[in-house]
Each structure stands twice: as structure tokens, then as C-alpha cells.
Amino acid sequence: VNQLAVQLKTTTNPDMRRYERPHINEVWCGDSSVGPYLKTDDGKKHRVYIIALIDDASRFIVGIDVFFNDNFVNLMSVIKSAVAKYGRPQLFNFDNGRSYKNKQMELLAARIGSVIHYDQPYTPTQKAKIERWFRTMKDQWMAGLDIRDFHSLDELRGNLLAYVQTYNQSPHSSLKGMSPQDRYFSEPNLFHRLSEEQIGHCFLLEIERKVSADSVITIDQTEYEVDCRFAKQRIKLRYSADLKDLFVVEADGTLTPIRLLNKKENAFVKREKVHLCRGEE
């Protein structure tokens, strides 16, 4: 112990304190954890990753899923599912990992009306609840798994979701004997829900592309055709992670669908002539 520091009441220790939000949906904390290895039907072993979101006030798991990759697209699917069920939080609490700290995440949070707080390095108390939950999950769920019983992500997912349901409905020592589920639903006026259409638009990825002279843009090595009025311009695009829905963002913010380039079909399309206005004669 540094006696001089004690006498002078100074310290180099950071001020880290436990905290708890007073109301539900104020803060959702998200994190990823490695799961078990899963041997699929092809005979190969694959590492499984678990992505989860916990409500700070209630310890209720609002979102969770299993994946073979820990990336932003999979994180977004967990957030989308949680928001569809329970509405949006006021704030997301994440670490500085690449899946969590990126432009797409910032755009997503802004669209749904949430803000993001990124933890400072070496401050474990800032996401203590989600890390403690992962430890509990590993002790209670993973430790009892016989991984030979599972041959697909869907099978493992179903087993994990059953465990999460049991956890959410069990009394919690930090909640004075209440279950996370009872605590979470004790404040029904604090659910800020979004419509299905809002969710569909908010959870689109966004990029910019330069349009070619013949009105073509490329995403993931696939060519798409846009309206000829965008030729040679730099445009903003929004698209679903599976690339089933793609849109040009118009100047007024509306979304105009675009389609795959079809060169054979274009060979029979009559081209529009450009008419230049010469004024009244």
C-alpha cells in the first residue's frame, strides 16, 4: 500500500463502481462469447459464437442467438429480433470490438432513435452484467451439454433458447427474488415499439457507390441496374444483409428499389431519347 498516497488521499486507481439503471430499456448491453464446437453432418467441427443482449435494470435477456461467425451482420440480426419483440432501448452499451464499433452500427442506432456508449478499455464494470451472465451460461448450460447430441445450429439454438427461457423466468438474487422476466415486464409504459415497416427500413445496410455511364453499380461482385438519371453520379444505397432488397436513397430520403442487371433483357428495351428544352419560339 502506498502510505503517502493514502495520507494525501490520492490514487492512480480508476474510479470503477457498480451501477444499475433504475428502469428497463434504458440500457441494453451486448457482447459475444465463444461457445462449444459443433460437429456438423459433413464431419467437420465448427466453433460456435453466441451473441447476446441483456437489459441492465432487469437482467432480462432480450436477444440471443448462435452463429458460426462473430460479425456485425449477425449482431444486427440479434438486435433486429430484440427490437421487433420489445422495442428500442435508449442506449446500447458495447465494447470496442470491430463488430460493434463501425459506421453501420452508428447508422442503425441513429435510425431507431438509440445512442451508443462504447466502453473504455480496461473498465470491466461497464459491461459486468453481460460478462457475468455469460459465465453463468457456461457453468449452467455449456457444462452440461453433450455436443454429440447436436448436428446443426438449429438444434443447438433450440436448446440454448430453452435455457434462456428458464433463466429469464427464474428468481434472481440481485432482483430481490423477482425473475428477470417479471422485472422486465413490470414497466409496460417503457416499451418504445417500432412498426414492422420502420424496422424493415431501419435495419438496412448502407453504402455509397459510383454509377457507371450505363447506369450500373456493383455490390459484392454482383451488378445491379439503377435509373439512367443516376448515371455517372455517386449515390447512396440501402440493402438487406441477404441482398434480397436493394434501394437507392433519393434526395428526399425515399427509397427506390433497384434490380439485378439483365443484359439480355436490356437488348430488347427501347431506349428513351433525351429531349433538350430550347425555350419558346
Residue ranges and their predicted role:
Residues 1-54, 58-61, 72-78, 85-90, ...:
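Mobile-element integrase/transposase regions
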Residues 54-55, 124, 249:
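Hydrophobic alpha-helical segments, especially N-terminal targeting/anchoring helices
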